[in-house]
Amino acid sequence: MTTVLLPRSLLALFPGVDRRHEVAPGTVGSVIAELDASVPGIRDRLVQAGPRLRPHINVFVDGEPADLATQCAEASVVHVIPAVSGGA
């Protein structure tokens, strides 16, 4: 199974949802679709029309930058990382 790790900032929008999820391997797009089946509404937070990842969302598969077409292997780890902004 492919492991998906969600950021705490996203978990705050979905109370009770675990940070770690195991899903079937496939493209990042299919991984997000499967994740949305168990966490309804999460796809809308990650993907915009096109479809493509929202500008403030970064996805890494096995440490490499990814988009919706990136393939995830059986043992892949997918990190969803929101952009961080702010100033001093």
Feature-to-residue mapping (PLM):
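Ubiquitin-like/PB1-type beta-grasp interaction modules and other compact soluble beta-rich domains
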Residues: M1-A88
